[in-house]
Amino acid sequence: MLAFQKALESGCDGIELDVQLTKDGEVVIIHDEYLDDLTDFTGNVRDYTLGELKSCNAGGKWQEVYGFQPIPTFEEYCEWASGNSLITNVEIKSSVYYYEELEKKTMELIERFGLKERIIISSFNHLSALSCKDFMPDMKTGALVENGGIANAGYYCKKFGFECYHPGVEGLTKEEVELCHKNGIEVNVWTINNMDDLENLYEWGCDGVITNYPDVCKSWLKAKKAKG
């Protein structure tokens, strides 16, 4: 949760996070399906109960600076998010392992805390993202794709009911952005960590970017708008 608070303090407009299910069916926030790289545990998230995972230190390379950082539940995040105005891009992590009821439980928490208007559901598993509409038909969803994108993304998203297209920055073109906008599709691009990419995406009229440096991007955007 510390990372989210730091992001809020940096002035960002929103947060991107990944959700998975524990062995006992609790929705938790963690990027990788396995624990080895980001925590002091080994193995897969799905092989541990929530109680077991709560003793896991997810501080990663920042442990010496920030100490013990537990893996947060999505419920804890939703409670925190209900007290601010941030947009949240929730990635359903179901491409490597399929978690039965992950979509249902995620949507129930979003509804309980009244966050629907500030949520975008995305996934590399497009069926998983779209299945969230079974529980909340007007939920905003994004087609998340790797670098290189997909052909005719604007048509694809419109055809299958996505409101957003979430491509990796590598290989994205101005023409693809224009096609998405022509079809009423928002374009939110990941992961933008250099200024040349940010400049291009701004000129192309992209709707949002996912970055590891929100404070830098916000300062740049503020200066850009000030110049007119």
Describe the residue ranges of each PLM region:
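Phosphate-group recognition and catalysis centered on beta-loop-alpha active-site segments
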Residues: 1-228
